[in-house]
Amino acid sequence: YPEKFDQLCKDLPDPVLFESQMGYKRAHGQASHDRLALQYRPALEKVLAPSWRNFIHELHSEAYKDFWREMLGLTSRTPVILTMHWHYAPSGASISPHTDARRKIGSHIFYFNTPEDWEEAWGGQTLVLDDGGKWPRHSAPVYTDLREAGASQVLGNRSFLFAQTDHSWHAVKAVQCPSGHLRKVFIVVANRLTPQVIWRRVRGKDADGYRLAGGVQKN
């Protein structure tokens, strides 16, 4: 449905709604994950375009959760708890090599740049990195410690789904785009129903720890 993709690109949330996460210190000695971030929560419905409301409602369907179960070989009764967020990255922003939290089953990254606002040569690809089973998840390898096993594509209405394991290292090298351009992705995270996720739900938070009743984020 290229026409729906085009509409979603046109209707992406305004960067003014996003929280800056540039230069934040990370655990285990890992370099920062530089981005502007907007966490989906129900309060956002009032400011999202109809195209995005419809897309998110579709992603919350049982059909999409069943897609996750089929892709990762889960049973039909395995709980799949979804969280979603937009990330925009300006020139120079990067995501250092890391694995995701154990509560995550995996991530599905949708890329929302077009040839009108992005070039593949500027970067932004999600890199799949092989550590040869040598690096513990709570560590900070650099690119020279890892082998690049694959990379996503940014343009062409692409998405990229991967499972979380103790060795599912991935990263994004510093994007090299002109000023005023942004790498734009929307990420759906599938989470396990862990004690942490249950406790967060009891406290009115989503699986990522954001308050479900929170208002629209603004800088």
Predicted feature residues:
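Non-heme Fe(II)/2-oxoglutarate
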Residues: 1-70
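Amphipathic alpha-helical surface "interface" segments used
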Residues: 27-34, 89-90, 206-213
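Short, cationic low-complexity segments
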Residues: 133-137, 203-219
